[in-house]
Regions:
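A short acidic, Gly/Pro-enriched loop at the edge of an enzyme's catalytic core
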Residues: 113-126
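Class I SAM-dependent methyltransferase Rossmann-like catalytic core
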Residues: 16-63
Length: 225
């Protein structure tokens, strides 16, 4: 897997959401409650088999394992080998119940409350697959992910070019795939909880492209070191 710095410059130190994203960036065509939109279970995959395999390859190459939080989870998590303990947080209880890889399931709407219902340093790694484009307060969510990660824990965000357009934020819909990488890079940088942001891109030949952007919570090292 080719690893590179995430495309585009990171926002300058001290930047705020208003400095980086224009007014209306996080608006959506359908502003109604996500719980209503996702009330009916969708036991289908949202990317093709090649892109699914690419997600699994990213997890394997990065060694995502241990106690892992699968953010905005559903009925499948795309891990070739299930982590030791996988916790799924999503919107639909039926979808989460159908996911055999999950050890624990939490129904929680991040667009209503971006706070994660977990203690500090609860997970070794975290993932978010093809869902980051629906977050209306993503920097708050990324900050929370950093809080619940242990030092050196990675947050791996994967996405393609498919979405539910009425629920995706306006800024995402108006941007191409390279722009999406830059958007996620900005989320990491603005959260203030992660180190260097890395990216992997698979162009896809006639199928769904797959992009991965990730960063780790810094490890401060031993006390007094």
């Amino acid at each position: 897997m080719t690893r590179r710095r995430a495309g585009g410059p990171s926002p300058p130190y001290g930047s705020t959401m208003a400095d980086v994203f224009p007014p209306g960036f996080f608006d959506r065509a359908d502003p109604t409650a996500d719980t209503a939109f996702y009330d009916v279970p969708r036991l289908v995959t949202h990317i093709d088999d090649a892109a699914i395999a690419a997600v699994g390859a990213v997890y394997t190459e990065l060694g995502v394992d241990g106690e892992v939080l699968d953010l905005m989870s559903s009925w499948v998590s795309h891990f070739p080998v299930t982590p030791r303990r996988l916790v799924g947080l999503g919107l639909n209880a039926t979808e989460l119940a159908a996911n055999p890889a999950l050890a624990d399931r939490v129904v929680h709407d991040l667009n209503v409350d971006p706070r994660l219902p977990f203690p500090d340093a609860a997970f070794d790694d975290a993932t978010c697959c093809v869902s980051v484009d629906y977050l209306t307060d993503p920097v708050a969510v990324f900050r929370e992910v950093a809080r619940v990660l242990r030092p050196s824990g990675r947050f791996v965000v994967t996405f393609s070019n498919r979405c539910f357009p009425t629920k995706a934020i306006r800024g995402w819909l108006s941007t191409d795939d390279d722009g999406h990488v830059q958007i996620v890079n900005a989320y990491f940088a603005l959260s203030g909880g992660f180190g260097e942001v890395r990216a992997h891109r698979r162009a896809g030949r006639g199928g769904d492209p797959l992009y991965a952007v990730w960063a780790a919570r810094p490890d401060p090292g031993p006390p007094g070191g």
